[in-house]
C-alpha cells in the first residue's frame, strides 16, 4: 500500500510538472491574465498598403474586363429582339378568329338557297299553265259544229297530203265518203268570218288532240279496272257502270279545259300548220294567219307565221 501511494504521488507530481512545462513553452496555453500583447500587431498597418496595391492593380484590370463584357450584353438585345416572335401568335390567333366568323355567312348562304329553289318551281308551273291557256283557242261551239266535216276529213286522213300518223286513228274512208266530207267542209268554211277562221281551224286540231288523250286515258282506266281472275268473276253490268263512272269526270275535265303537256303543245303547232296548208288550198278560201306573241316553254315553237 505504501508503495502504491508513493507511485501515485510521483505520477501526480510528474503530470503537474509536465503541465507547467507545456504552458511555458506554448504561449496560447497560458492563462489569460498572464498573456502579453503580441508584437505582430504592428504588421496590420502594412497590410492595408499591400491590399491597396493589390486593389490598385486589380481594380483597373476589372474595368477592362468589364469593358469586354458590354459586347456580351450588347449581343443579348438582339436575342431579346428575337423574342417578339412570341407576340406574333396573337395575329395568328386573330387569323383563326377571322376564319371562324366566315362560317356564319356560309350558313346564311345555305339557308336562303332552299326557299328560292322551291318558290320558282310553282311559279314555273303557273307560268306554264298561263301560256298554255293563252294558246288554247276560244271558239263558239256553233262554229265547231259547222266545221265538224273538216274535223272528220282531217282526222280520217282523207286528203292525199301526208298527215301525221296520229291523225289516222281509224280505217281510211272510201273515196266517195272522203269526197262528201271535202264538199261539206268547203261549204261550211267560207261561211265562218274571215277573222275567226284561223282560230276555228286551231280549235279543230285542239279537239282532235283532246279526243286522242281521252281515248288513251279510257284505255288505261279500263285496264286498271279489269279485276284479276282469282276464282271470282265480275258481271258485265258492274264493269260498264264502273267505266261510266270513270269516264264522267274525264268528260267534265275536257269540258272545263284540259292543260296540254309540252309534247302536246308541239303536236298542236305541227298539226295546225299542216291543216292551214291543206284546207285553204282545198276550198280556195283565204285564211289570215296571225303569229302568236307568247313564247311556249320547254323549247316549243312560237306559233304559226304567215304564209
Curated annotation (Swiss-Prot):
Which spans are transmembrane here? none
For this UniProt entry, the molecular function terms from Gene Ontology, in alphabetical order, are: nutrient reservoir activity
Per UniProt, the keywords (alphabetical) are: Disulfide bond, Repeat, Seed storage protein, Signal, Storage protein
Question: Biased composition, Low complexity: where in the chain?
Answer: 43-88
Tissue expression profile of the protein: Expressed in endosperm, but not in husk and leaf tissues.
Signal peptide region:
1-23
Among SUPFAM superfamilies, the record links this protein to: Bifunctional inhibitor/lipid-transfer protein/seed storage 2S albumin
Which branch of life, at top level? Eukaryota
Region Disordered: start and end of each range? 31-88, 105-126
Q: Which InterPro entries match?
A: Bifun_inhib/LTP/seed_sf, Bifunc_inhib/LTP/seed_store, Glia_glutenin
Pfam families referenced in this protein's UniProt entry, alphabetically: Gliadin
Report if keyword Disulfide bond is assigned: yes
Q: What does this protein do, in the record's words? A: Glutenins are high-molecular weight seed storage proteins of wheat endosperm. Thought to be responsible for the visco-elastic property of wheat dough.
Q: How does it assemble?
A: Disulfide-bridge linked aggregates.
**Miscellaneous comment:** Glutenins are coded by several genes on each of the group 1 chromosomes of wheat.
Family in the record:
Belongs to the gliadin/glutenin family.
Tell me what this protein is called: Glutenin, low molecular weight subunit 1D1
What is the organism field in this record? Answer: Triticum aestivum
Amino acid at each position: 500500500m505504501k508503495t502504491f501511494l508513493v507511485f501515485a504521488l510521483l505520477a501526480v507530481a510528474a503530470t503537474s510538472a509536465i503541465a507547467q512545462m507545456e504552458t511555458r513553452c506554448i504561449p496560447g496555453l497560458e492563462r489569460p491574465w498572464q498573456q502579453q500583447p503580441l508584437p505582430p500587431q504592428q504588421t496590420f498597418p502594412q497590410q492595408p498598403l499591400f491590399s491597396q496595391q493589390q486593389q490598385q492593380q486589380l481594380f483597373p484590370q476589372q474595368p477592362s474586363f468589364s469593358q469586354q463584357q458590354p459586347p456580351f450584353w450588347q449581343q443579348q438585345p438582339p436575342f431579346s429582339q428575337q423574342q417578339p416572335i412570341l407576340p406574333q401568335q396573337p395575329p395568328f390567333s386573330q387569323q383563326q378568329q377571322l376564319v371562324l366568323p366566315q362560317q356564319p355567312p356560309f350558313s346564311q348562304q345555305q339557308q336562303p338557297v332552299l326557299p328560292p329553289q322551291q318558290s320558282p318551281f310553282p311559279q314555273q308551273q303557273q307560268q306554264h299553265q298561263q301560256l298554255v291557256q293563252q294558246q288554247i283557242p276560244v271558239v263558239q261551239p256553233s262554229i265547231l259544229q259547222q266545221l265538224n266535216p273538216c274535223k272528220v276529213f282531217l282526222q280520217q286522213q282523207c286528203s292525199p297530203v301526208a298527215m301525221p300518223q296520229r291523225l289516222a286513228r281509224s280505217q281510211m274512208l272510201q273515196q266517195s265518203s272522203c269526197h262528201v266530207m271535202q264538199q261539206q267542209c268547203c261549204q261550211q268554211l267560207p261561211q265562218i268570218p274571215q277573222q275567226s277562221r284561223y282560230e276555228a281551224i286551231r280549235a279543230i286540231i285542239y279537239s282532235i288532240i283532246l279526243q286522242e288523250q281521252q281515248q288513251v286515258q279510257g284505255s288505261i282506266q279500263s285496264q286498271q279496272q279489269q279485276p284479276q281472275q282469282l276464282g271470282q268473276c265480275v258481271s258485265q253490268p258492274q264493269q260498264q257502270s264502273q267505266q261510266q263512272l270513270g269516264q264522267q269526270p274525264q268528260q267534265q275535265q275536257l269540258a272545263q279545259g284540259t292543260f296540254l303537256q309540252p309534247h302536246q303543245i308541239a303536236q298542236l303547232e305541227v298539226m295546225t300548220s299542216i291543216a292551214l296548208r291543206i284546207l285553204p288550198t282545198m276550198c280556195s278560201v283565204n285564211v289570215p294567219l296571225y303569229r302568236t306573241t307568247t313564247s311556249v316553254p320547254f323549247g316549243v315553237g312560237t306559233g304559226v307565221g304567215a304564209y
